[in-house]
Amino acid sequence: MNWLTPKAQARSAGDKGWGSFAIEPISKGETVGSFGGWSVPREVLATLELERQHRAIQVDDDQYLVSKEAREPGDCFNHSCEPSCGLMGATVLKARRDIAVGEELTFDYATCDDSDYDEFKCGCGTNSCRGTVTGKDWQLAALHTKYAGEFSPYLALRIANEF
């Protein structure tokens, strides 16, 4: 089961599918969502319908959390290269800054992904847009500084040991 703050609402995000948007002001540091569901290895993830694969979140080298429902409000967080939210641990999202009503709640998938299960052309439109989101973006040195303390634990350990 995923959770979305009552200060946000999941709805259509145009070409991006579904997203979560603030319906009340959200303060920096507030918990805005958490991911849940069942943990599956990549081999099982690959057998699920495409939408469910795209809504999974990688939590370890070969483990992905998948929602029990095809779409839950708490799993509608899109990627941005300049995100409004960041990961705390493997499954909790917190506001990185104050978020105004109407703003989309986003996080950078580089902070949790190390595989190609959800690679795509980025359309975030920010000044720091990487153009393509890949499972290897976590290796970019600039992101180590930008997202210090916001990487999923398995990636934080890799960064500490490899870089």
Residue ranges and their predicted role:
Residues M1-G86:
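Catalytic cores of histone-lysine modification enzymes
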Residues H79-F163:
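C-terminal SET catalytic tail plus cysteine-rich post-SET Zn-binding segment of SAM-dependent SET-domain
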